[in-house]
Amino acid sequence: MTANDSFGRLDDDDYPAYTMGRAAAMLGTTQGFLRAIGEARLITPLRSDGGHRRYSRYQLRIAARARELVDQGTPIEAACRIVILEDQLEEAQRINAEHHQRSDPAS
Protein backbone atom coordinates (compact mmCIF):
# COMPACT_ATOMS: atom_id res chain seq x y z
CA MET A 1 0.00 0.00 0.00
CA THR A 2 1.45 3.37 -0.98
CA ALA A 3 1.28 6.58 1.02
CA ASN A 4 -1.42 7.87 -1.33
CA ASP A 5 -3.49 4.71 -0.77
CA SER A 6 -3.17 5.16 3.00
CA PHE A 7 -4.21 8.80 2.79
CA GLY A 8 -7.33 7.83 0.86
CA ARG A 9 -8.36 5.41 3.62
CA LEU A 10 -8.37 7.97 6.44
CA ASP A 11 -12.16 8.29 6.10
CA ASP A 12 -12.50 4.53 6.68
CA ASP A 13 -13.65 3.86 10.28
CA ASP A 14 -11.83 0.51 10.23
CA TYR A 15 -8.49 1.80 8.95
CA PRO A 16 -5.83 1.56 11.71
CA ALA A 17 -4.61 5.14 11.40
CA TYR A 18 -3.64 5.90 15.00
CA THR A 19 -0.60 4.85 16.99
CA MET A 20 -1.05 3.78 20.59
CA GLY A 21 0.36 7.08 21.87
CA ARG A 22 -1.92 9.15 19.64
CA ALA A 23 -4.95 7.01 20.49
CA ALA A 24 -4.30 7.37 24.23
CA ALA A 25 -3.90 11.14 23.86
CA MET A 26 -7.11 11.44 21.84
CA LEU A 27 -9.02 9.51 24.52
CA GLY A 28 -7.39 11.31 27.43
CA THR A 29 -6.19 8.00 28.85
CA THR A 30 -3.00 6.01 29.16
CA GLN A 31 -1.35 3.47 26.93
CA GLY A 32 -1.76 1.04 29.82
CA PHE A 33 -5.54 1.43 29.59
CA LEU A 34 -5.42 0.56 25.89
CA ARG A 35 -3.26 -2.47 26.65
CA ALA A 36 -5.70 -3.55 29.39
CA ILE A 37 -8.76 -3.42 27.13
CA GLY A 38 -6.75 -5.29 24.52
CA GLU A 39 -5.91 -7.99 27.08
CA ALA A 40 -9.62 -8.11 28.00
CA ARG A 41 -10.26 -8.68 24.26
CA LEU A 42 -12.52 -5.67 23.90
CA ILE A 43 -10.48 -4.48 20.94
CA THR A 44 -7.63 -6.09 19.04
CA PRO A 45 -5.38 -3.46 17.52
CA LEU A 46 -3.72 -4.22 14.24
CA ARG A 47 0.07 -4.21 14.11
CA SER A 48 2.29 -2.10 11.89
CA ASP A 49 5.10 -3.72 9.93
CA GLY A 50 7.33 -2.82 12.88
CA GLY A 51 4.97 -4.55 15.35
CA HIS A 52 3.46 -1.39 16.85
CA ARG A 53 -0.22 -1.30 17.80
CA ARG A 54 -2.46 0.72 15.47
CA TYR A 55 -6.06 1.69 16.20
CA SER A 56 -9.03 2.58 14.00
CA ARG A 57 -11.67 5.21 14.70
CA TYR A 58 -14.17 2.43 15.39
CA GLN A 59 -11.85 0.94 17.99
CA LEU A 60 -11.36 4.37 19.56
CA ARG A 61 -15.13 4.79 19.92
CA ILE A 62 -15.31 1.40 21.67
CA ALA A 63 -12.37 2.33 23.91
CA ALA A 64 -13.96 5.69 24.75
CA ARG A 65 -17.14 3.95 25.92
CA ALA A 66 -15.11 1.60 28.12
CA ARG A 67 -13.17 4.57 29.53
CA GLU A 68 -16.48 6.31 30.34
CA LEU A 69 -17.66 3.28 32.32
CA VAL A 70 -14.33 2.93 34.14
CA ASP A 71 -14.43 6.62 35.02
CA GLN A 72 -17.85 5.99 36.61
CA GLY A 73 -16.30 3.33 38.84
CA THR A 74 -16.96 0.17 36.85
CA PRO A 75 -14.09 -2.36 37.01
CA ILE A 76 -12.31 -2.61 33.67
CA GLU A 77 -13.28 -6.25 33.08
CA ALA A 78 -16.95 -5.45 33.71
CA ALA A 79 -16.75 -2.32 31.55
CA CYS A 80 -15.38 -4.37 28.67
CA ARG A 81 -18.16 -6.94 29.05
CA ILE A 82 -20.80 -4.20 29.13
CA VAL A 83 -19.43 -2.61 25.95
CA ILE A 84 -19.38 -6.00 24.21
CA LEU A 85 -23.00 -6.65 25.22
CA GLU A 86 -24.06 -3.15 24.12
CA ASP A 87 -22.41 -3.72 20.74
CA GLN A 88 -24.10 -7.12 20.35
CA LEU A 89 -27.48 -5.64 21.27
CA GLU A 90 -27.07 -2.82 18.76
CA GLU A 91 -26.19 -5.32 16.03
CA ALA A 92 -29.16 -7.56 16.91
CA GLN A 93 -31.52 -4.56 16.82
CA ARG A 94 -30.14 -3.53 13.41
CA ILE A 95 -30.62 -7.04 12.02
CA ASN A 96 -34.13 -7.22 13.50
CA ALA A 97 -35.09 -3.89 11.94
CA GLU A 98 -33.78 -5.03 8.54
CA HIS A 99 -35.73 -8.28 8.85
CA HIS A 100 -38.95 -6.41 9.66
CA GLN A 101 -38.45 -4.08 6.70
CA ARG A 102 -38.03 -7.04 4.33
CA SER A 103 -41.00 -8.96 5.71
CA ASP A 104 -43.42 -6.00 5.87
CA PRO A 105 -45.17 -5.78 2.47
CA ALA A 106 -46.32 -2.21 3.20
CA SER A 107 -42.71 -0.95 3.24
Regions found by a protein language model. Give the residues of each.
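Short coil turns linking two alpha-helices in DNA-binding domains
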Residues: T30-F33
